[in-house]
């Protein structure tokens, strides 16, 4: 949908309809809802990562355009998803014209975060030989799901945020460059412990920092707060419990 169909509004408003969603077709089926929102140019590449750890690639112009209130098309009509797969995260690679090969830069990395607190870093160039039927992006244990994927230059600070409002912040390299927190490893491999979770807790998001970054945390019931990235304690090593980023209550959801 063209961005011109949307307008800037103040916080606290009702907003306007961004998409018509599909209602449940029976008692055993849930109604559809929006999970991902991003902007991209027509010739950019979209990297779709699924909950089972596979990756699919499409160009933006290959996705049919629809009005702001249109229902759109099922992603399964565009990607050869397997029966159990759903989209967990999307990365955008900016088109480089005749030099599209340059998008798969050797100094860029894909950082994965899974439901059980595992993280993995893999060189972006390992994904350039993609196939229509998808490729393995990360190996997952049974019962674990891929939750979020971000792009990094290998020298970022990472924040892992959990369902119960915890946040673990650590640097990719750590204090000792000879023994980094996150080493680049192969595509079809599992990862390492990123955060220690309490019983019943799980990862909901992963972000990396930029200069003067602010962290926006939004709860299920629409409460949000903005905090400077530096207010989160930097852990010397990955795998810690982190600190509270939001007190989760009945009010927040």
Predicted segment positions?
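Short, structured "edge-of-domain" segments at secondary-structure transitions
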Residues: 1-253
């Amino acid at each position: 949908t063209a961005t011109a169909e949307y307008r800037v509004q103040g916080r606290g408003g009702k907003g306007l309809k961004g998409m018509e969603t599909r209602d449940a077709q029976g008692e055993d089926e849930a109604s559809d809802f929006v999970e991902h929102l991003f902007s991209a140019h027509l010739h950019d590449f979209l990297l779709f990562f699924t909950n089972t750890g596979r990756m699919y690639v499409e160009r933006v112009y290959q996705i049919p355009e629809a009005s702001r209130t249109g229902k759109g098309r099922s992603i399964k009509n565009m990607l050869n998803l397997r029966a159990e797969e759903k989209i967990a995260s999307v990365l955008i690679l900016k088109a480089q014209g005749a030099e599209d090969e340059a998008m798969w830069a050797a100094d860029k990395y894909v950082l994965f975060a899974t439901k059980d607190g595992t993280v993995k870093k893999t060189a972006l160039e390992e994904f350039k030989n993609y196939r229509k039927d998808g490729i393995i992006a990360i190996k997952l244990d049974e019962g674990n799901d891929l939750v979020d994927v971000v792009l990094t230059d290998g020298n970022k600070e990472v924040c892992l945020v959990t369902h119960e409002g915890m946040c673990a912040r650590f640097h990719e390299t750590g204090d000792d460059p000879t023994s980094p927190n996150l080493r680049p490893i192969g595509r079809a491999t599992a990862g390492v412990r990123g955060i220690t979770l309490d019983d019943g807790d799980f990862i909901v998001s992963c972000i990396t920092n930029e200069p003067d970054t602010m962290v926006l945390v939004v709860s299920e019931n629409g409460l949000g707060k903005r905090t400077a990235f530096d207010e989160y304690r930097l852990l010397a090593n990955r795998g810690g419990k982190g600190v509270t980023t939001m007190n989760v209550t009945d009010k927040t959801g």
